[in-house]
Swiss-Prot record:
Positions of transmembrane segments: none
Family in the record: Belongs to the RNF181 family.
Zinc finger extent (RING-type): 70-111
Catalytic reactions on record: S-ubiquitinyl-[E2 ubiquitin-conjugating enzyme]-L-cysteine + [acceptor protein]-L-lysine = [E2 ubiquitin-conjugating enzyme]-L-cysteine + N(6)-ubiquitinyl-[acceptor protein]-L-lysine
GO MF annotations, alphabetized: ubiquitin protein ligase activity; ubiquitin-protein transferase activity; zinc ion binding
Pfam families with a match to the protein in the record: zf-RING_2
Keyword Metal-binding in annotation: yes
UniProt source species: Drosophila melanogaster (Fruit fly)
Keywords, in A-Z order: Metal-binding, Transferase, Ubl conjugation pathway, Zinc, Zinc-finger
InterPro entries: RING_finger_E3_ligase, Znf_RING, Znf_RING/FYVE/PHD
Protein name: E3 ubiquitin-protein ligase RNF181 homolog
Length: 147
């Protein structure tokens, strides 16, 4: 059977070979979640662009002795250390958060999600955000109608 597909210039699983199967499985999982089926999917790492755009805060003497502590390693801030600031405004040691964001795309404290390079996961993120916005508009409307 594979000779038939090779003769036509196609792989039996698609142009990307076995990767097509994995991509399609993930797409089906996302569609299932969008349709209300409760399931877990693997969360990809944060995109390289999102990581590069994180602002850096270098600790100076006046910052020391404050309440700033890296929530990943639990070490207090010291002069000369570099902290990265996530869009949610939480700060972490540069080394700690870069290692964290290579495993997942969310803040260790509040789970704010940074963008990823995975188009299927990004579609799910947009869907979740649209649903949250829809619920907020619905609640606002109901509050205005029924006080």
């Amino acid at each position: 059977m594979s000779d038939y597909f090779e003769e036509l210039g196609h792989e039996p699983t698609g142009p990307l070979g076995a990767n097509d199967l994995a991509r399609n499985l993930k797409r089906l999982q996302v569609l299932a979640i969008m349709n209300g089926i409760d399931m877990e999917i693997e969360v990809p790492e944060a995109s390289k662009r999102a990581i590069l755009e994180l602002p850096v805060h270098e600790i100076v003497k006046s910052d020391e002795g404050g309440d700033l502590e890296c929530s990943v390693c639990k070490e207090p801030a010291e002069e000369g250390q570099k902290y990265r600031i996530l869009p949610c405004k939480h700060e972490f040691h540069e080394e700690c958060i870069l290692l964290w964001l290579k495993k997942t795309n969310s803040c260790p404290l509040c789970r704010y999600e940074l963008e990823t390079d995975d188009p299927v996961y990004e579609e799910l993120r947009r869907f979740r955000q649209d649903e949250a916005n829809r619920r907020e508009r619905e609640n606002t409307l109901l509050d205005s109608m029924f006080g």
